[in-house]
Amino acid sequence: MLRTKDLIWTLFFLGTAVSLQVDIVPSQGEISVGESKFFLCQVAGDAKDKDISWFSPNGEKLSPNQQRISVVWNDDDSSTLTIYNANIDDAGIYKCVVTAEDGTQSEATVNVKIFQKLMFKNAPTPQEFKEGEDAVIVCDVVSSLPPTIIWKHKGRDVILKKDVRFIVLSNNYLQIRGIKKTDEGTYRCEGRILARGEINFKDIQVIVNVPPTVQARQSIVNATANLGQSVTLVCDADGFPEPTMSWTKDGEPIENEEEDDEKHIFSDDSSELTIRNVDKNDEAEYVCIAENKAGEQDASIHLKVFAKPKITYVENQTAMELEEQVTLTCEASGDPIPSITWRTSTRNISSEEKTLDGHMVVRSHARVSSLTLKSIQYTDAGEYICTASNTIGQDSQSMYLEFQYAPKLQGPVAVYTWEGNQVNITCEVFAYPSATISWFRDGQLLPSSNYSNIKIYNTPSASYLEVTPDSENDFGNYNCTAVNRIGQESLEFILVQADTPSSPSIDRVEPYSSTAQVQFDEPEATGGVPILKYKAEWKSLGEESWHFKWYDAKEANMEGIVTIMGLKPETRYSVRLAALNGKGLGEISAATEFKTQPVREPSAPKLEGQMGEDGNSIKVNLIKQDDGGSPIRHYLVKYRALASEWKPEIRLPSGSDHVMLKSLDWNAEYEVYVVAENQQGKSKAAHFVFRTSAQPTAIPANGSPTAGLSTGAIVGILIVIFVLLLVVMDITCYFLNKCGLLMCIAVNLCGKAGPGAKGKDMEEGKAAFSKDESKEPIVEVRTEEERTPNHDGGKHTEPNETTPLTEPELPADTTATVEDMLPSVTTVTTNSDTITETFATAQNSPTSETTTLTSSIAPPATTVPDSNSVPAGQATPSKGVTASSSSPASAPKVAPLVDLSDTPTSAPSASNLSSTVLANQGAVLSPSTPASAGETSKAPPASKASPAPTPTPAGAASPLAAVAAPATDAPQAKQEAPSTKGPDPEPTQPGTVKNPPEAATAPASPKSKAATTNPSQGEDLKMDEGNFKTPDIDLAKDVFAALGSPRPATGASGQASELAPSPADSAVPPAPAKTEKGPVETKSEPPESEAKPAPTEVKTVPNDATQTKENESKA
């Protein structure tokens, strides 16, 4: 058992040592076509000098170092077989043979399998197709085993779409029948080999090209030549890819690359072709061609170029008398072919015209027309106009037919006139060449010495023989003879003695109440000269004289009626007619009797309409007819559009001659009825029908400027007008009442004083006024409101409605009246010594706005009364006023100041000015020249101050209203103003009022210093463009200094005494007397008494004062 085992191992080792073992790694080989792979042949054994060889499947030994199938001997025990880029033919069993040194061989084999991997041999992308064709998408798949092909689109199997248009062909191509643009996209060709689980795919982009479509916007385009026009031809093309455009003209390409081609201009995409300066040569058929990959298409546009007609040929012609015919020719060009017409200066000749005798024949063919005149007459000569017309326009040319003929004479053969009446015998001459004209009488050439009353006037077309018959011998035959080189012609004229016309015949008379219409026939014989007028005579039965009236013959002959007016109703009349010509009044007709109708209703007026220029208004004229013997009271007019309601009736005065109907409906028919009415009743209605114009589409040139404004524009205009009215009102309030927005701005921004400040000054009895920022006088107004009971125990009489507002002016030359009449104006009137100034009163004054300032300036005088003064006892009190004596206890009432700030002050005259106190005026103010303001004046010292005045009650009349205070015992003082110097010294009366004897014997007082022109004692404040003085200013001093008047004396208390009233109205005009002075209230005067100039008081005459007390008068 043991020996057997050992024997086996011994045999094994012996066998191994003798034979070699060959192995190939890898033992199996699969290669895809195109891939490379190597195999290693290894030998195991101790044999030396072995030979390793490789054999191909066909048994051929593979030589080493080949390029595609390479064999490399690595060492004694191994060798490598490498197959590069294997193909199907390389498949098979490869054998590795090892040969030992003793010749024994050992081998090993490897089965090399080569398979075709899934490959897309023919599957291009993109693949393009034409829309509508059957598209086949190519996809060739190469594989060792037959693959399964699946087509997908948008991730889905196209077969599963159940679209019969999609078919997979036997060669695995995909067919799409009638491919659409919507089928465009990416298609996936996917191949699968189930045995190997191999899969591969290829995405193919499918593009569907759409053949171009092109359409001309206009197949026919019209243009007009030679007008500098441009025309654009447009083609709209569509397709995919976007087609390119090209153009041809009558088959010839129009190049788009010529930069210097100013005739043709292309758009960026060449879809538009613009032809500039179109002329006739541009007329052609233009083709636009659209082309892309899918094909091409074209469209045609026919450019039709029209041309205005143009006359290309005309020729003047000359013809002789007795020639048979002449032809005028006219040629014209144009497109469309123009039609040619003929006309002369007086008539149109139709293209088909042919007179009965064949005198004119018109023939036309294409562009040529001819006018043939047969049996030519001299009247055929002249201008012939050839006109060529088509739808584009027209052209005309003139040609002239010159006809040479003997003279032809025309004119009225019988000419009527009378002795002493100048008349012209007219001999009209038609001749070519021009003829020489001569006049003969009884074979004698005119003019001649035997016929001094004959004159001849020649014109190119006629000769006039002016004859003024002196006797019967001048009447008879006159011969006119014309001669030219063709021949001559003569014509006899007869100058006939004219006669008066025969009588017209009255057919019938149509009487009415106050008129009658006489219908007549014209005279049978006019006497050879025209009838100028008709004379109608009529009278009532029993009257001896005839009434008559002349009627123009032209108007009367139109209707054969004359109307007699102004007749009496129900009265019998006789009427007769006569005609008047240049010779004289003709026979009068037989009288015809008629009787007027009784008083009745009037006849309907005659209506005539005249449409307005706007088209929807009418002026209906009313022509008065018979009034029925009673004056017409009025006319009643009513109108309406047909089938509409009547408009409200219109009543017109009897004197109306028309009625205007406006704002009528457009294009509507209206009817108008007019009835005349007198005391007897209404007439029949006169009826008038008219139609308005159609509403215009455009605004007429003479239409209303706002007719075409929109609602917004009208509202805007109204707003602007409203704002302007507010501005005007504000400015008015500023200047009149010192209020409003403008005043607020002036107060807050410009520092002006407001109306409240001015009112405060008014309450204090002060006022300031200024103009152009200059200092002006401040006027203090004094009024006397109450009369003291000791003035003769009388009371002031209340004026009634019969009391005059102003007293009669005294005839003295020294009266100056100043009245304020709005608007603010300063008027200085110098009449002898009279000065009148007008100021604007304060806006806040409760009185009216009229102030009368009367000043009296007394000349230097002694204490002796003026010899011309009238004693107080002679003065007669004015009506309604009780004379009373002044009392020292009574004091004038200080009224609020008059604001004259808005009134420009004009300087009075430099001449001597003097004034006297008006009758029944309590005080006077004496204005003077500004130059005298700086002068000083002296006056006697004043007496003691009077008691303080009593304040005015709230319910009293306006404090500016002057109270008439006449006095019968106070003489007036006369005062004279110097011309160039300041006021001279003058006498003054004591402060207390004295009776007339005392006033006459009062001694003169020492003189005092007058006020200067700058009396301001306080700070100047700007107000209303002037200087406002502080309340501590001596107002009276300022006023009199500015006016150049002496200042009145004041008492110790600074209050002026009462002034002596002026004399009342008297039968004898009073002479100027000395004026008694009263103290003037001031705040800055010292207590001691000073001599002051004569006082001046202001009388305000209000326009409308409120009467509250018995002692207050109406202004």
From Swiss-Prot:
Glycosylation sites: N222, N316, N348, N424, N450, N479
Superkingdom in the source lineage: Eukaryota
GO MF terms held by the record: heparin binding
Post-translational modification: Polysialylated by ST8SIA2 and ST8SIA4. Polysialylation modulates cell interactions by confering both attractive and repulsive properties that are highly regulated by ST8SIA2 and ST8SIA4. Polysialylation is formed on a-2,3-linked sialic acid of core glycans.
Composition skew (Basic and acidic residues), residue ranges: 758-799, 1019-1037, 1074-1091
Low complexity bias: start-end ranges: 800-809, 845-856, 876-896, 936-974, 999-1012
Compositionally biased residues, Polar residues: 902-912, 926-935
Keyword ATP-binding among UniProt keywords: no
Database matches in PANTHER family: BASIGIN RELATED, CELL ADHESION MOLECULE DSCAM2-RELATED
Official protein name in the record: Neural cell adhesion molecule 1
Native species: Mus musculus (Mouse)
